[in-house]
C-alpha cells in the first residue's frame, strides 16, 4: 500500500483490538459457523479482536449522522424523514465480503436491539444472463458494464429518502437472476449493501454509489491469496453440485476434478483478476475503513480514513 493510502491511519491488529473494552461477543461458535461462507475462516477471537471494535466505531458514525440530520432539520426549518444508516462492503470475489456482511448484520442487530438491520447484495442488479448474452457480455459478468447501475442508483435514492423498495434476487446456484422473485427492502435503521461494485459507477461520473453511504468497508488481500480462496470455493461448490443437476456447477463435473480446476483457474486469470486489478482494487481508497487480510483470511491490519 503506497501513497494511495496517505489519507489513512494504519492500525495493527494488536492496537485495534485494544480500542474496544473487552467483553463477551454476543454470539456463539454455532451461530458464527452458520453465517460463515463456504471456505471462509473466522473465529470467535476474530469477532472479539476485529469486529467488536468495528461495531464501536460504527456507533460513533451513527451518532454523528443523527446529530447532523437533526442540525440540518433545524437549519432547513423542516422535518427530515428517518433515513437508514447505509454501510457499503466491497472487495474481490472470494475475499470474504458475505461473511463480513452477515456478521455485521448480526452484531448490529444485537448491539442496537430496537433497530432493524437489512442486508442485500448488488448481484440482483446484474443484467439477466439472456440480456448479457444478447449483448455478447457473458464473459464480462461482474464487470461494471454488466450491472444496471441506473436502477441501482434509483433504488439507493428511494431508500435514502425513507421509502421502501423492491429489488431483484440473484441465485449463485443457477448463476442468474431468479425470474418472478424479488426482495422487499423496508425502511430499516441499518442497511448493509455488499458487492464488488459498491464504489463504482461507470454510467454517471457525477454520482457514485458511495455518495449514499454513511460508512464503507473494503476487504483487501494479496491477489495470490484471493486466487487460492477462489479455487477452494470453486472446488467446494463442485462437490455440493454432485447430486443436483439444476445446479450451475454440476456442468463442470464432466471435466473431471483437474479439468474443472484448470477451468476455474482460467476464469480467475482472464476475468476475476482483470476485474479486480482494473475496476475493484482502484476504488478501495473510497472506503472509510480497509480490512487487510493475510493467509487463512486473518485480518492483520486495519486502515481508517483520517
Curated annotation (Swiss-Prot):
ATP binds at residues 91-98. It comes from Streptococcus mutans serotype c (strain ATCC 700610 / UA159). Signal peptide: none annotated. It catalyses: (R)-pantothenate + ATP = (R)-4'-phosphopantothenate + ADP + H(+). HAMAP family: Pantothen_kinase_1. Its EC number is 2.7.1.33. This is Pantothenate kinase. Gene3D superfamilies: P-loop containing nucleotide triphosphate hydrolases. GO terms for biological process: coenzyme A biosynthetic process. It is found in: Cytoplasm. GO terms for cellular component: cytoplasm. Belongs to the prokaryotic pantothenate kinase family. Keywords: ATP-binding, Coenzyme A biosynthesis, Cytoplasm, Kinase, Nucleotide-binding, Transferase. Transmembrane segments: none annotated. The gene is coaA. Pathway: Cofactor biosynthesis; coenzyme A biosynthesis; CoA from (R)-pantothenate: step 1/5. GO terms for molecular function: ATP binding; pantothenate kinase activity. Pfam families: PRK.
Amino acid at each position: 500500500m503506497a501513497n494511495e493510502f496517505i489519507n489513512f491511519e494504519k492500525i495493527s491488529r494488536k492496537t485495534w483490538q485494544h480500542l474496544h473494552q473487552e467483553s463477551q461477543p454476543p454470539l456463539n461458535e454455532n451461530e458464527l459457523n452458520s453465517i460463515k461462507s463456504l471456505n471462509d475462516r473466522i473465529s470467535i477471537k476474530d469477532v472479539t479482536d476485529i469486529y467488536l471494535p468495528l461495531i464501536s466505531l460504527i456507533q460513533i458514525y451513527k451518532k454523528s449522522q443523527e446529530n447532523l440530520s437533526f442540525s440540518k432539520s433545524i437549519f432547513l426549518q423542516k422535518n427530515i424523514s428517518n433515513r437508514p444508516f447505509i454501510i457499503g462492503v466491497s472487495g474481490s470475489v472470494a475475499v470474504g465480503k458475505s461473511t463480513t456482511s452477515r456478521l455485521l448484520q448480526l452484531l448490529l442487530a444485537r448491539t442496537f436491539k430496537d433497530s432493524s438491520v437489512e442486508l442485500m447484495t448488488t448481484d440482483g442488479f446484474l443484467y439477466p444472463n439472456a440480456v448479457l448474452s444478447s449483448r455478447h457480455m457473458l464473459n464480462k459478468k461482474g464487470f461494471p458494464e454488466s450491472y444496471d447501475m441506473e436502477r441501482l442508483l434509483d433504488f439507493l435514492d428511494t431508500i435514502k429518502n425513507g421509502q421502501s423498495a423492491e429489488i431483484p434476487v440473484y441465485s449463485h446456484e443457477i448463476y442468474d437472476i431468479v425470474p418472478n422473485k424479488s426482495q422487499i427492502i423496508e425502511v430499516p435503521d441499518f442497511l448493509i449493501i455488499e458487492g464488488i461494485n459498491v464504489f463504482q459507477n461507470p454510467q454517471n461520473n457525477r454520482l457514485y454509489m458511495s455518495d449514499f453511504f454513511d460508512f464503507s468497508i473494503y476487504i483487501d488481500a494479496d491477489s495470490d491469496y484471493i486466487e487460492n480462496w477462489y479455487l477452494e470455493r470453486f472446488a467446494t461448490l463442485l462437490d455440493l453440485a454432485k447430486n443436483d443437476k439444476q445446479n450451475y456447477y454440476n456442468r463442470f463435473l464432466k471435466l473431471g476434478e483437474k479439468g474443472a480446476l484448470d477451468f476455474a483457474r482460467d476464469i480467475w486469470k482472464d476475468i476475476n483478476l482483470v476485474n479486480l486489478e482494473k475496476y475493484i482494487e482502484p476504488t478501495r481508497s473510497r472506503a472509510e475503513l480497509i480490512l487487510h487480510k493475510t493467509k487463512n483470511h486473518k485480518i492483520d491490519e486495519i486502515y481508517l480514513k483520517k
